[in-house]
UniProtKB/Swiss-Prot annotation:
CDD domains: UreE. NCBIfam families: PRK13261.2-3. InterPro entries: UreE, UreE_N, UreE_N_sf. This is Urease accessory protein UreE. It comes from Actinomyces naeslundii.
Length: 163
């Protein structure tokens, strides 16, 4: 079966809508959320082709690929190997952001309310895909950070820019 559009998101459905519903999952790595055309297989063996229109939003955790009388098939994210950076001072944040930005490493930012085990009490974090040279740099500077597996809410992307 070819999927050409998303049928909503499981996280937007009321709990009672999911009672007695057979739920299958398609586990995707973060990078595959941006792919418009791909072939996937659910954890129950259902094969699907995905062919989304150009300009369609990226896939995200919980997107419903298929909904029929047998149940639903949803997108689940494979955890990503990331470095979570929790600078203590504004100067430390500026130095790290400047140097990692010069390396064009895509980053995501989270506020103090977002929990990151091992970095409790942070004032905000910067998250990048794991890179051993970035980790070495952070260790050299003595910046508080942790390597962890995490399901990221959106894919890492490079921002367009010019020099």
């Amino acid at each position: 079966m070819i999927i050409e559009s998303i049928s909503g998101n499981i996280h937007d459905l009321p709990g009672e809508d999911l009672e007695d519903v057979h739920v299958e999952s398609v586990v995707l790595p973060l990078a595959d959320l941006t792919k418009r055309i791909q072939r996937v297989r659910s954890d129950h063996g259902t094969e699907l082709g995905i062919r989304l229109a150009p300009g369609a939003p990226d896939l995200r955790e919980g997107d419903i690929l298929l909904r029929n009388e047998r149940g639903i098939v949803v997108v689940r994210l494979e955890p990503t190997d990331v470095l979570v950076i929790a600078p203590v001072t504004v100067r430390e944040m500026g130095v790290v952001a400047h140097n990692l930005g010069n390396r064009h490493l895509p980053a995501q930012f989270f506020g103090p309310a977002e929990p990151f085990p091992g970095l409790e009490g942070h004032d905000g974090v910067m998250v990048i895909q794991y890179d051993h040279t970035a980790e070495h740099y952070l260790e050299h500077l003595g910046v508080r950070h942790a390597r962890m597996e995490r399901s990221m809410p959106v894919p890492f992307r490079h921002a367009e820019h010019t020099h």
